[in-house]
């Protein structure tokens, strides 16, 4: 379980997060939602130890984040950020291998190769394994980085807008894949995401931010409501039933 206790973050005199406290459920897909600048990515970076909070603390599995050894932490959580730097002469397979570094220390064994092959197959880019990253489309590169995150094979996976640059087919494929990692392997996935219909269909739990404050949280069905979404986004969003799920309509 991830426990967030009274987290605040400010840059100079401006707070981007204010006194956020919550517990993120394990073995679930947790969606961080909210408008641009609400604090979602900042919180994701704090719980992955990429960013130090101004106040407060985070614990993972009962241990304060600051007390984790870096290598042990890298075997426990994966973080895929919004900004991805692309080394020009690196192949897809070479990139995905980096996901195994915390486990192999650079010396790949059979188990590492199996994880790499599995990640390439799951993301449907095995045929691109020998292609250089700078030869790929933005969507294909995004899939390669997601494959790297999957190859790391950690209990916790943190993804900041992983659907960027993906077409509808690939975006839906990735969300289904992430859900299967939760259901079949017991992963805990925290995802920053703007498409609330993907949230409605695939997330188990939602944490919503507004102006740096945690304004709503709970099971997805408790958040996908017109009154709650209006409070989060400041706009009217129609909700229509679709089987046992809900579709949000916000184009009018």
What are these regions (language model features)?
Residues 33-35:
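The feature captures the beta-strand-to-loop junction immediately N-terminal to the Walker
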